[in-house]
Amino acid sequence: MSAVLIAVLALLALCLLGGAILGFAAVRFRVEGDPIAEQINALLPQTQCGQCGYPGCKPYAEAIAGGDKINKCPPGGEATIQALADLLDVEPEPLDAEGGEKPQMVAYIREAECIGCTKCIQACPVDAIVGAARQMHTVIISECTGCDLCVEPCPVDCIDMIEVGSNLQSWKWNRPLAPGQLIATDREQAA
């Protein structure tokens, strides 16, 4: 055998061995799903409300990972947009004008009018409505995300969306800035 043939066979054997190792590694260390979509989904509010135009938060997260805009989530508001912008290293955009940031709302069931059909319970994506068939239903306010998916299926129209009032738990306190954190124009206004 000539030296060239031995070299070609040796290279062929090395290539086959390397291919087998890479094939094994591809199967053994395969990543399930899209990791960036999972990180995006973790930042979304999980209301599954559909106000973004997608049927839930996970499809919207996959769309963002595929290049869709990050400003279509009204329940998440500006805080979610900023967190998504930081994660994806893009410029934050104002909330989409079509959705718009609205005051926080919760569902309120007028219990005297409720017929107990359970359609609102089935429509609620976060199980914030409790009740039994042919019994009145009520909303667990701390669980309600204000997505208003329960309003439309109600056959007697006894569900209203009301604005959450400010209390000590929901009121946003403005933190005063320390003098070292103020920029020159802020110092002039503070004086």
From Swiss-Prot:
[4Fe-4S] cluster 2 binds at residues 114, 117, 120, 154. It is found in: Cell inner membrane. Its main location: membrane. Its cofactor is [4Fe-4S] cluster. The gene is rnfB. [4Fe-4S] cluster 3 binds at residues 124, 144, 147, 150. PROSITE patterns: 4FE4S, 4FE4S_FER_1, 4FE4S_FER_2. GO terms for molecular function: 4 iron, 4 sulfur cluster binding; electron transfer activity; metal ion binding. InterPro entries: 4Fe-4S_dom (IPR007202), 4Fe4S_Fe-S-bd (IPR017896), 4Fe4S_Fe_S_CS (IPR017900), Elect_transpt_cplx_RnfB/RsxB (IPR010207), RnfB/RsxB_Proteobac (IPR016463), RnfB_subfamily (IPR050294). The complex is composed of six subunits: RnfA, RnfB, RnfC, RnfD, RnfE and RnfG. Binds 3 [4Fe-4S] clusters. Part of a membrane-bound complex that couples electron transfer with translocation of ions across the membrane. [4Fe-4S] cluster 1 binds at residues 49, 52, 57, 73. Residues 32-90 form the 4Fe-4S domain. It comes from the Bacteria. It comes from Stutzerimonas stutzeri (strain A1501). Keywords: 4Fe-4S, Cell inner membrane, Cell membrane, Electron transport, Iron, Iron-sulfur, Membrane, Metal-binding, Repeat, Translocase, Transport. This is Ion-translocating oxidoreductase complex subunit B. The keyword Repeat applies. Residues 105-134, 135-164 form the 4Fe-4S ferredoxin-type domain. One of its GO terms (biological process) is electron transport chain.
